[in-house]
Amino acid sequence: MIQNESRLKVADNSGARELLVIRVLGGSKRKTGNIGDIVVCTVKQATPGGVVKKGDVVKAVIVRTKSGARREDGSYIKFDENAGVIINADKSPRGTRIFGPVARELREYDFMKIVSLAPEVL
């Protein structure tokens, strides 16, 4: 579960390395986010020459969480890190590559471009 002030690793080549969550979108009472949720973040670390710079406010979708997500069949999927992909207003990724596995649940939230770019879908 991702909440305000959580740090996310960036799983794309947009130029950011680490994000700090400012807000979980989806209602005024919403406290936590899980895989497939959109969050507003600020870039805390960035690589030189990237698309995004340190201090930029961006939107990202959560693709991996340590706490995991429950599936329809009762199983859970957990990852070793919390990670996100920076997206545009039309839910397309800002980067051109995705690093690491992503959860199958992203298909249900219409992030098909991220799923197609990912090297592995679990």
UniProtKB/Swiss-Prot annotation:
The reply on keyword Ribosomal protein is yes
Which GO biological process categories is it annotated with?
translation
Which InterPro entries does this chain map to?
Answer: Ribosomal_uL14 (IPR000218), Ribosomal_uL14_bac-type (IPR005745), Ribosomal_uL14_CS (IPR019972), Ribosomal_uL14_sf (IPR036853)
Keywords from the UniProt entry: Ribonucleoprotein, Ribosomal protein, RNA-binding, rRNA-binding
Q: Which GO terms describe its cellular component?
A: cytosolic large ribosomal subunit
Which GO molecular function entries does the Swiss-Prot or TrEMBL record give? large ribosomal subunit rRNA binding; structural constituent of ribosome
Q: Extract the Pfam families matched here.
A: Ribosomal_L14
Which NCBIfam families does its entry note?
rplN_bact
Q: What does this protein do?
A: Binds to 23S rRNA. Forms part of two intersubunit bridges in the 70S ribosome.
Subunit structure, briefly?
Part of the 50S ribosomal subunit. Forms a cluster with proteins L3 and L19. In the 70S ribosome, L14 and L19 interact and together make contacts with the 16S rRNA in bridges B5 and B8.
Family according to the record: Belongs to the universal ribosomal protein uL14 family.
Record-linked HAMAP family: Ribosomal_uL14
The name this protein goes by in its record: Large ribosomal subunit protein uL14
